[in-house]
Design a protein with these regions (language model features):
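Gly/Pro/Ser/Thr-rich low-complexity, intrinsically disordered segments predominantly at protein N-termini
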Residues: 1-198
Length: 198
């Protein structure tokens, strides 16, 4: 992550500022940061998007995976996150006031699943985004820690590649861990192939 702007912004200012077709940026507490994923990070995210897209078609679900969208936390106008993969409910989009103009999601019920692929800034995925997505009521959140970078309290000791599937139960996330050749199971999707992590 690289800080881009020296002044803080609101989400609306950030969306007005966001450069078309250049870079990938998030807003963290008013600070614009450029996300610079590695090739492997992008490959892993792409594998998950492909697998989920196949399942969506096979099951004929009214969902789609946008190329990019911004998730606005429920109680902040100074943050906006771009998940690595988002699965949105096509039928619920009419209820989202910011979608058509800014591809921004403010209501958790529009989202079926979010995936973050862990980078060196793993605390954002395990702490900040986890808490914000839970508050929004997003039913599923997957953390794909393909390098085993997260804290031991999350992925165990010794650290190793892990996929954490958080499911919202009575307003709180409950986690299941998957490793190596485990079949990833979730309430919405079962990825039948082996774990897409390299």
């Amino acid at each position: 992550m690289i800080q881009v702007e020296s002044k803080t912004m609101t989400l609306d200012e950030f969306l007005d500022w966001y450069p078309d077709g250049y870079g990938r940026f998030e807003l963290h507490d008013g600070v614009v940061v450029e996300m610079q994923p590695t090739g492997t990070h992008e490959r892993v995210a792409g594998e998950f998007a492909t697998e989920l897209g196949i399942e969506i078609r096979r099951l004929q679900l009214p969902y789609f995976i946008p190329r990019q969208c911004i998730i606005k936390p429920i109680d902040s106008d100074k943050s906006g996150f771009i998940p690595d993969v988002a699965v949105l409910d096509e039928n619920a989009l009419d209820a989202e006031p910011m979608w058509k103009k800014r591809s921004t999601i403010t209501k958790g019920e529009i989202v079926r699943l979010l995936i973050e692929v862990v980078s060196t800034n793993w605390q954002d995925d395990y702490l900040t985004k986890l808490a914000e997505y839970e508050k929004l009521g997003i039913p599923e959140y997957w953390i794909v820690d393909y390098l085993g970078l997260g804290g031991r309290r999350y992925i165990g000791n010794p650290k190793r590649p892990t996929i954490l599937v958080y499911q919202l139960v009575d307003g709180e996330y409950v986690v299941s861990l998957f490793r190596e050749n485990d079949r990833i199971e979730s309430p919405t999707f079962w990825i039948s192939s082996t774990n897409p992590c390299p």
